[in-house]
A protein has these predicted regions:
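Extracellular S/T/G-rich loop segment that most often corresponds to the catalytic His/Ser-adjacent loop
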Residues: 208, 325-400
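Short acidic, glycine-rich surface-loop motifs adjacent to enzyme active sites
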Residues: 275-297, 314-316, 488
Length: 581
């Protein structure tokens, strides 16, 4: 028999259980999505953890009035560059080629993206952009709307069949922090005076958190254009003006190149498409999030590089002495990541980022990152922000010499890597790169030598159901000299993701074989971690003078084609073990 006390206790327990059940349901509604929806929503963070938890994202959201979202639509990725072949010899040929690629991309993506946008009530977003050339929609949304009814908006978007992924951008972006001091370090001035190369006919795009001051005296008589439209309130910044000056001012690397400047607002697709519509050959990015994570931005830049045959050069970041985290842009496997050396080219600056969380190696190369006196700007600068435009300027000079390099980004990266030197006896990793310096410190003299005296190649390797050799070519090397061979092959994006597993990187090997004896004198890429990288450096002392066959092959079958870039050079070792002049 129940006493009144027992009944009261039962009632109290029941009430407590009801309260707890309500709290649980509230928590579940707020922080638990169905598995189908949860798999399609990614909160991208800014620390070493690739994604933030719902608790962490809420703290960040509550501190922001608006937040960026990057929506991947549910359609197949295509690579226009693999679908359209054209001989390119002149700058006019390049423009015709790029227009054809954009038309292919537009026909495949634009209407499907519009259909997807119509299903998600795009009118509630600010700064919305529907991509013409890739499977993305980007927008900004008021934080209050995003969090309303326990993230009902996110759940609604992710539940649509036309949507593949929704990325909530909670990252912190920052710019990665006269000119002749640094240029002397790469042996540029003397070669510029004797060769006369100025980057003429080359178009450089620049993506920054700000735009250039078009009226700055450094751009007098130059083609220096900033996107200025009423619906994008872009801000002129000294950082953007400084980066551009390194490339195209009279004292810059490529003074006759044209430059197009755009401010990075939300997700990068709208800004990059504006640059593509200017027919740029190179995109310099001295900005990003230093997280060491491969994220949706990394995947996007990887895709654009190969799909539209444009070289993307990115600052590695300035976190070297704070944790080492690489910029998310520079994490792209098809992106040319640039670290910072000192202005004397004797070593890598301590601030230069080098750490990645996916096992790949970055940076690709290093260039001077200090010794910059910013004429007509009124400040000094240092860091990888100023290293990247040196490489972009050198690429413009190379493209002026050989216009076909404009549409061969893998070849251009291979050449840059082969043109590097490093006189400090640090250990290389299994792919032939130094931990902090990548392939080494850039030399313009070496770059010209490769372009004019050594063979370098760009080829498309078809999809194959077999393993083994996919590319072979003969090079002639001299006994006693050091041979440096650089190879890089394209990574193909199959979906945007915060995981590098979204990028298909074929597992490949590189052998160097003596053509006369058949002996393998150097081999790389046979280890269990070969799948982590899409680039190798082979560096060895040549045993005998003669022909050597470079053999590049796959260790596994694959269903997609690759672009391969190969470059090589030889040099003599000085008595102290450094590279002789």
């Amino acid at each position: 028999m129940f006493t009144s006390l027992k009944i009261n206790r039962i009632i109290c327990i029941y009430v407590v259980l009801l309260v707890l059940f309500g709290v649980f349901n509230s928590f579940k509604s707020k922080y638990y999505f169905t598995s189908e929806v949860a798999d399609k929503i990614v909160f991208e963070g800014h620390d070493k953890t690739s994604n933030l938890s719902y608790f962490e994202i809420e703290e960040i959201l509550e501190a922001e009035e608006q937040i960026s979202i990057f929506i991947e639509t549910n359609q197949s990725y295509i690579y226009p560059s693999l679908m359209y072949e054209q001989e390119v010899e002149t700058n006019e040929d390049v423009i015709e080629y790029r227009e054809a690629l954009k038309e292919i991309g537009r026909e495949h993506y634009f209407l499907s993206n519009i259909h997807a946008a119509s299903s998600i009530e795009l009118n509630i977003f600010g700064d919305a952009h529907i991509s013409q050339y890739s499977p993305y929609i980007s927008a900004k949304v008021d934080t209050e709307i995003l969090m309303k009814n326990n993230y009902e908006l996110l759940k609604s978007i992710a539940s649509k069949a036309s949507i593949a992924k929704v990325f909530v951008k909670a990252d912190e972006k920052e710019n990665q922090n006269f000119i002749s001091t640094a240029i002397d370090g790469i042996e540029f001035t003397n070669y510029q005076n004797t060769t006369g190369y100025t980057g003429s006919g080359i178009r450089i795009g620049m993506l920054e958190y700000g735009i250039i001051d078009e009226d700055n005296a450094n751009f007098d008589g130059k083609t220096a254009v900033a996107r200025t439209v009423w619906y994008f309130p872009e801000t002129v910044t000294p950082h953007a003006t400084s980066v551009a000056s390194i490339m195209i001012s009279d004292e810059g690397i490529a003074p006759d190149a044209s430059l197009y400047s755009v401010e990075w607002f939300n997700s990068p697709d709208g800004e990059i498409e504006w640059l593509l519509d200017q027919n740029v050959d190179i995109i310099n990015i001295s900005a990003g999030t230093s997280s060491a994570n491969y994220d949706s931005d990394s995947a996007y830049f990887d895709y654009i590089t190969i799909a539209y045959s444009v070289l993307i050069v990115a600052a590695a970041g300035n976190e070297g002495d704070l944790g080492g985290e690489m910029s998310n842009v520079a994490m792209g496997k098809n992106v040319l990541a640039v670290g910072a050396s000192d202005s004397e080219q004797t070593g890598v600056m301590m601030l230069s980022s080098y750490l990645t969380n996916n096992g790949d190696h970055k940076p690709n190369v290093c260039a001077p990152g200090d010794g910059f006196d910013m004429m007509n700007i009124g400040e000094t600068g240092f860091g990888t922000s100023f290293s990247a435009p040196i490489i972009s300027g050198l690429a413009a000079v190379a493209m002026e010499i050989y216009p076909y390099l404009k549409i061969q980004p893998m070849r251009m990266i291979a050449i840059m890597q082969a043109a590097c030197f490093y006189d400090i006896d640090f250990t290389k990793n299994e792919w032939g790169f130094y931990e902090y310096a990548g392939a080494g410190l850039i030399s313009f003299a070496n770059l010209l030598e490769i372009l004019n005296y050594y063979d370098n190649y760009h080829t498309q390797i078809p999809a194959s159901s077999t393993r083994g050799s996919m590319y072979e070519n003969l090079f002639t090397f001299t006994a006693g000299k050091v041979c440096k061979i650089s190879v890089i092959w394209s990574a193909m994006v199959s979906s945007a993701s915060s995981s590098p597993s979204s990028v298909q990187t074929n597992v490949c090997y590189l052998n160097v074989v003596n053509e006369t004896t058949g002996a393998v004198v150097f081999s790389i890429g046979t280890s269990s971690t070969a799948y982590l990288s899409n680039k190798y450096i082979a560096e060895f002392v040549v045993p005998t003078t003669g022909d050597y066959r470079i053999v590049f092959g796959r260790l596994e079958t694959n269903s997609h084609a690759d672009y391969l870039g190969v470059a090589a050079r030889q040099y003599t070792l000085a008595d102290d073990g450094t590279e002789a002049d």
